[in-house]
């Protein structure tokens, strides 16, 4: 079997290419998180009179701008609450502005809220959305939001898989998602596009970065229907189940 040996000059050249490639990856990740600053928002929700299964109080989460002409921001339904609530939104280093609920789907845990485009800061931008492809296992991602009130911060990880164990179909990721991250973007670190909405983490004391995000492909379908003036709400059946038969 013939063995090839790199000449010293060629070896140095290969090392330089690898070093340059690594630096480009680092710079790209930094730019992607920097871009997230301009479309991610902080959301404060105040609930005084909650519906059943909701709670009264003040809650915080994240969201991101998806339609700058309409002023639409995407987040989780549990961030803004299905109960009557006061929802306020702030871009980075900006003051809070009152937001209006446009659409809420508790099954998908999806909400679309709206603020006036006049309230946008000059450096705002609309998030690029991945509306067609599902990321494969191993795809590098970044979660962005406000974990434990550490505002506008990011974490990194990979896509661990896609699961339907939670009722709906979710992306599973080991990128840390904590309280305050809910509703924020899960971003592809290859393309810079938002591929999901950070939604939850596995509720177990032994959990080590088993976290979940709503697939952006479903969110894009809802946005498309809303832009067309159609109601994207799932159909409702007018009956209920009883745990015990009537006597």
Name each region found by the language model.
Residues 64-65, 177-198:
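Catalytic nucleophile loop of clan PA
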Residues 2-12:
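Bacterial N-terminal signal peptides that target proteins for export
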Residues 27-35, 99, 117-123, 194-247:
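C-terminal cap/linker of serine protease catalytic domains
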Residues 76-81, 155, 179, 196-204, ...:
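Short beta->alpha transition motifs characteristic of CBS
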Residues 68-145, 149-152, 167-170, 230-234:
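Conserved active-site neighborhood of the chymotrypsin/trypsin-like protease fold
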Residues 28-31, 48-70, 95-98, 183, ...:
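A conserved glycine-rich beta-strand in the N-terminal activation segment of trypsin-fold
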């Amino acid at each position: 079997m013939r063995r090839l040996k790199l000449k010293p000059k060629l070896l140095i050249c290969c090392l330089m290419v690898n070093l340059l490639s690594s630096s480009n990856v680092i710079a790209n990740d930094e730019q992607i998180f920097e871009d997230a600053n301009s479309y991610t928002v902080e959301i404060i929700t105040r609930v005084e009179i909650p519906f059943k299964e909701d709670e009264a109080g003040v809650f915080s989460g994240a969201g991101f701008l998806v339609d700058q002409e309409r002023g639409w921001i995407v987040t989780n339904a549990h961030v803004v609450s299905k109960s009557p609530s006061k929802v306020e939104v702030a871009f980075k280093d900006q003051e809070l502005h009152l937001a209006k609920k446009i659409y809420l789907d508790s099954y998908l845990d999806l909400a679309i809220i709206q603020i006036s485009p006049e309230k946008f800061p000059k450096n705002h931008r609309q998030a690029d959305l991945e509306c067609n492809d599902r990321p494969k296992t191993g795809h590098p991602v970044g979660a962005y939001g406000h974990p434990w009130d550490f505002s506008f911060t990011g974490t990194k990880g990979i896509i661990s898989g896609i699961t339907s164990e939670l009722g709906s179909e979710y992306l599973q990721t080991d990128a840390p998602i904590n309280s305050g991250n809910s509703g924020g973007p899960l971003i592809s670190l290859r393309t810079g596009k938002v591929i999901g909405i950070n939604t939850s983490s596995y509720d177990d004391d032994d959990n080590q970065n088993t976290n979940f995000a709503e697939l952006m492909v479903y969110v894009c379908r809802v946005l498309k229907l809303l832009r067309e003036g159609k109601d994207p709400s799932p159909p409702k059946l007018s009956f209920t189940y009883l745990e015990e038969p009537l006597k």
